[in-house]
């Protein structure tokens, strides 16, 4: 996308043929976040990067309970890493709060709840019980190892969250025990 390499993709689970793309920051313009409508035909591309960091790589994009609720995270040091939108990417709010300065590799809202989030970081899994802008309080998960974690997935059939780590394997926990 405009000279950048795609680093994250999210297909909307709510709207047919709607896809979000995040990029790295190799171009002079820095990283981008793009919403593509009509991905199966004559696409409509909308840059939804305004207000987001440019000196980083988009590591993950996820939706909440609808396409208006978005969470995006960045992988770099010295930047604000986690952002949410409640209006489909028109505007963004940083929710780093008290999170240490480290890359965030994956982010997701808690299933069915846009006020809670779970993230995978350079130092393990963190969660918040209340997204509250710059006052968001992040807690390291006691049930996952303190090691670089690259991806999280939620399995709705049994309420399990899986965390893929770098060097410690795959860990699972019920969402309620996080």
Regions inferred by a protein language model and the residue ranges of each:
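Beta-strand initiation motifs
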Residues: 40-46, 89-93, 133-139, 178
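Conserved Ser/Thr-centered positions that define the repeating blades of beta-propeller domains
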Residues: 36-38, 64, 85-86, 92, ...
